[in-house]
Amino acid sequence: MLLSTQSIPIKKSVDDIWPVAGKRVLIRVDFNVPTSSGGIDDDFRIRSAIPTIRRIVDQGGICILISHLGRPTGVDYDTAHAEQEKRQTPVQLPNSRGKTAFFSGLRGDAKATILAWSSQREKAATLSNPYGSGKTAVFARLPEEEKRRLLLRFMSEHKEELFPQLGSAGYEKEFSLEPVAVKLAELLDQHVYFGHDCLGAQADIAKLRCGEVMLLENLRFYTNENSSDERKRMLMARILASYADVYINDAFGTAHRDSASLTGIPRVLQQGAAGYLMEKEISYFSKVLNNPPRPLLAIIGGAKLSDKMQVLENLLDCVDSLFIGGGLAYTFLRSQGYSIGTSHFEEAFVPFAQALPLAGSGRQVRVVLPEDHVCHAHTRPAEAPLTTTSANIPDGYAGLDIGPLTIQSITHLVRQCSSVIWNGPLGMFEMPYYAFGTFSIARVVSQSSAAKGTTSIVGGGDTASAMMKSGEAAHISHISTGGNASLELLEGKVLAAVAVLDNKE
């Protein structure tokens, strides 16, 4: 019973690309972290990227990080570039007074840079103090053509400094990665530079020295990142690739996507390696899906059956037992004639839910459903919920968590097996009344891993968050950073961003 993950060749990793000293190493990370009020709510994904970043820094590489955050509206690069061209018109000022006024608004160090290019002897005395006075007066006395030449040169070589507003194409404050840069600096215990425009960072990157780190602004501020138009994606990929001597993908959470930063850059550079996190993710999933210690139990929860159908079908070819919980269980219970009250179910998939347990039986896979429920007439109750004594849910009530009988059954399954895959919470764990089931199973899986070495993989953003909140994460073999990426692996698919990386020789 094997899945197609077995066919993934072993990829080059961080340790296969030495030496990196003095090289610009572009690392695609997954810093798509939950935020609120400008703060980081959960830094798990940031911490997961530290080993790769630290290795490059310690070896003297120049570390350039790129990521997305959330779903900003974004702008097209060509549109943004055209707007930038319009904003450059101030250098075409018609008279000396206009050019001088423009010069007077620049910073002291920028003025010093411009005057240093001048052929006029009298400007030299003003350069001893880059923040001193007198530079504007010197500039005002320069010949008109000299002023024009100097401003055009500064415009060309210091575009980001001259027009800082050009670095905000597509900018939305709530999706900015700048707070992530602050958190990363804290975790690395070193300064992290921030590039305000991911497609206009050439000048900033050129200033970086060996061992330094820069995080660029949100890739999705440009719609090119995930554009359906390959030409637009590759335009962005070529710009990003121009920053790099070496490309590393350490963003497992987005490895299922065909986007500029994930598949485009390695195609442009014709090289790419897996970061330590990516390598670890692929290794664990490949092991547990293709050659796991047996018996193997899969616990699949979540809200909708339609999101997990292919996963469930594929797992029948690899697991020994399959527990189906969370919101998707109610369609299965409905298909078997149980009363589910007002619990959400998907009528269109009732035939699938009827057929899956039979298919499992034919493959010697035990398919297990909830035996009882914690439920309520409202999804946000002020009083204690009702716990049923059977799989039936009373009219007017909705199931929001598994009950004690179900917890006992899953506990028995976990203690019997040698490997566990868990994807999807088993209840509305964000609310205290409905967290007990999910947290109880987290405790059982953790204890089994600690006591008898059970291989345990927890995948999916909500499941990883639940595991962290339960306080039981320490003994889990692997908590995946991937949501849809881990689902696609469970479905037996090869991830697009992994396929384009170099195979290990």
From Swiss-Prot:
Subcellular location: Glycosome
EC category name: transferase
Residues binding (2R)-3-phosphoglycerate: V29, D30, F31, N32, R45, S67, H68, G70, R71, L219, R220, H256, R257, K304
Highest taxon of the lineage: Eukaryota
Keyword Kinase assigned: yes
Pathway assignment: Carbohydrate degradation; glycolysis; pyruvate from D-glyceraldehyde 3-phosphate: step 2/5
GO BP terms: gluconeogenesis; glycolytic process
Cofactor(s) the protein needs: Mg(2+)
Pfam families xrefs: PGK
Enzyme Commission numbers on file: 2.7.2.3
Annotated residues for binding of ADP: G302, A303, K308, G326, G399, N423, F429, E430, D462, T463
Gene Ontology molecular function terms on file: ADP binding; ATP binding; metal ion binding; phosphoglycerate kinase activity
Residues that, per the record, bind CDP: G302, D307, G326, G424, L426, F429
Chief site of localization: other
PROSITE patterns xref list: PGLYCERATE_KINASE
InterPro entries assigned to the protein according to its UniProt record, in alphabetical order: Pgk_euglenozoa (IPR027250), Phosphoglycerate_kinase (IPR001576), Phosphoglycerate_kinase_CS (IPR015911), Phosphoglycerate_kinase_N (IPR015824), Phosphoglycerate_kinase_sf (IPR036043)
Positions annotated to bind ATP: A303, K308, G327, G399, E430, D462, T463
Catalytic activity: (2R)-3-phosphoglycerate + ATP = (2R)-3-phospho-glyceroyl phosphate + ADP
Residues binding Mg(2+), per UniProt: A303, D307, D462
Family statement: Belongs to the phosphoglycerate kinase family.
Name the UniProt record assigns to this protein: Phosphoglycerate kinase, glycosomal
Organism of derivation: Crithidia fasciculata
